[in-house]
Amino acid sequence: MINYIFSKSNILINYVGFTVVWFSCVYSGAQGNPIIAIVPTFIFLLLHFSIVTDHLKQEIQLIIISIILGLVVDSSFSLLGFVKYNGTLDFAPNLAPLWIICMWAGFTAQINHVMKFLIGKYLLICFYGLLAPLAYIAGEGIGAAIVKDTYLSYGFISICLLYTSPSPR
């Protein structure tokens, strides 16, 4: 019973933690202040790592791989002209900004926890991947990014994120 309660509360902590990270990252992009994204992400990851002590090494590896993959994918979106992110570095305007990298780290921390119910549910995984453009629409609405050539961009973003997102173990 105690293990059940802890497992459910850990999922809730993980979900709420990522929600805070997501909003702080998008707000960080809108404000052009990376600290707004870094601090909540760091706190969330510390809390997350304290929960996943039984497979900490694998979780850290997954997050690092996801950060690298996210950097490549979102930088490609910018380089191809699909998305213009706010908060980029002056000397590397097509490099995905820090707030996007923080978002990838936070998102990946959910994969083996909040999204664990997706294991083996391939249609649901595809549907979840197709919802990714909604995050870009919300980010655009808040002022963190501008999506250009809307239909083509959102289609491309959906396909890329569907194929690049790690799946639950």
Where are the language model's segments positioned?
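Conserved small/polar residues in nucleotide/adenosyl-binding loops
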Residues: 163-169
